[in-house]
């Protein structure tokens, strides 16, 4: 019998029951909850007269609907102007209060984006099964965990039973060897991966990211890569546990302490694929061939190096892809053959669960330091992913660097990643965004999103158009 992949080990460790129809019951260790996908789940529990099976496994925080300006945040929940958004946050508060669920409320210093708060507090740990009613839950797989997004009915089911009905996926290894060049970031790595395999390339798979580049990558970088596994079509992404993982987790609020820490580390050391493990698919990239990336279309797979030009749909032989390219160019207001560097931006967004951690903030600050935002850029906002990130950045004086350069420093939240709060694009506006999705209308009706790294977004804010940050 061959060895096991990391995914095999995590699956087997949490398998409660294998069913004849191919589905299985998985035990869930950690359930992260936010205000958008939980109200109906809590109401379902209430109607069925059920209580959460393990209250101590649930951690909640509002993020999608929260305002990011200091003025609105000063009034707490009441400061949320949109009535629907306000009700969703209030409902989360009341449900958590009623059931005794730990919640980092809107003005709690620990509040933030669920996928930032989970790892940084130690609520999400290696070896866990982790679910949240949000597709980017895959982020937490960077810890050596099995982390998946679930729907609202599944949120209710996990609350009630501590189990999830799921079918085992196939396993894919995405191996990135070699070394990254200067100015090339984890965001560029994952965009390059998606550009290679497409947004359906990982469908039906759990992706393990490996190779020299991943082994040398910081934990925050790994979180960025696993965050966008879903954009490659995979429900889960993960990275094997190593010293970088353990050093990151040690000392965090919810991490084991003392003797329990030593026991945990001993167990976590096995959270890696065996040398003789066989994957269902293997994809290989070379780190030195990856350049700073910019998305040009309305799907994350429509991405190119910054020094490239927009492709011509007429040269595409696949009719479906050709039609998709034509529609994307029309929506984005771009032309085939146009240089990426000739795309001007109206707004810049540095934040989201993909790129709002302290390393991301530092990278952006390094680019804008001593420079001034281009007058043609209407707005450039920097939104830390959590209260902890915000406090750390301010302790380092990074907020002042942004403000002096003409960028806005905001409060934690999902912000302009999606049009569910006050931070939105106007119709036809182009945005250099460090988020994860560039779908039509994702950042606002008619908004045109270009996915980039924090450093590339910061450079665009200064230049007013896309530039190669390596030459900036």
Curated annotation (Swiss-Prot):
Pfam families: Aconitase. One of its GO terms (molecular function) is metal ion binding. GO terms for biological process: L-leucine biosynthetic process. InterPro entries: 3-IsopropMal_deHydase_lsu (IPR004430), Acnase/IPM_dHydase_lsu_aba_1/3 (IPR015931), Acoase/IPM_deHydtase_lsu_aba (IPR001030), Aconitase_4Fe-4S_BS (IPR018136), Aconitase_4Fe-4S_dom (IPR036008), IPM_dehydratase_rel_enz (IPR050067), IPMI_cat (IPR033941). Binds 1 [4Fe-4S] cluster per subunit. Pathway: Amino-acid biosynthesis; L-leucine biosynthesis; L-leucine from 3-methyl-2-oxobutanoate: step 2/4. [4Fe-4S] cluster binds at residues 353, 414, 417. Residues 61-80 are annotated as: Disordered. Keywords: 4Fe-4S, Amino-acid biosynthesis, Branched-chain amino acid biosynthesis, Iron, Iron-sulfur, Leucine biosynthesis, Lyase, Metal-binding. Its cofactor is [4Fe-4S] cluster. It catalyses: (2R,3S)-3-isopropylmalate = (2S)-2-isopropylmalate. Its EC number is 4.2.1.33. Catalyzes the isomerization between 2-isopropylmalate and 3-isopropylmalate, via the formation of 2-isopropylmaleate. Belongs to the aconitase/IPM isomerase family. LeuC type 1 subfamily. Heterodimer of LeuC and LeuD. This is 3-isopropylmalate dehydratase large subunit. It comes from Saccharophagus degradans (strain 2-40 / ATCC 43961 / DSM 17024). The gene is leuC.
